[in-house]
Design a protein with these regions (language model features):
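N-terminal and secondary-structure boundary signal
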Residues: 1-128
Length: 128
């Protein structure tokens, strides 16, 4: 079995352009081709900018990722989360700034607990 590749890069600030560059370099270094639909699941455990501002992925990171994907011609992008506290994830997504990001980028943001689900058989799926 092939060992997985892991890329670690330093980013000194939450700057979407710098993050986009790191993601671009990483995609190139891994030899990836990205096409089709892309689902981005940031980690939004909770969000409270006053008390626990480090319990979610900063939306600027996701903005950089969205920019990189759009640069590659990906147009079907969705951001979604399903929190585990019993509190609607949309509240955390809003507090964290993901709905503002959606307005800025045109990428929809969904709460997976409130969104319609559909079973899809992956006929060409491969276990990694």
């Amino acid at each position: 079995m092939r060992k997985p590749n892991v890329i670690l890069r330093k980013c000194g600030e939450y700057n979407p352009d710098a993050i986009r560059g790191i993601i671009d370099d990483s995609i190139r270094d891994l030899g990836l081709t990205i096409n089709g639909s892309v689902f981005i699941k940031p980690n939004v455990v909770s969000a409270n900018k006053r008390y626990i501002d480090s319990s979610y992925t900063n939306p600027l990171v996701v903005e950089g990722m969205v920019g990189s994907l759009k640069d590659r011609g990906v147009r079907d992008i969705v951001i979604g989360e399903s929190g585990g506290y019993g509190i609607p994830s949309r509240l955390f997504l809003k507090e964290a700034g993901y709905f503002d990001l959606s307005k800025k980028t045109g990428v929809p943001v969904i709460d997976l607990n409130e969104h319609a689900q559909e079973k899809i058989d992956l006929t060409k799926g491969v276990w990694h």
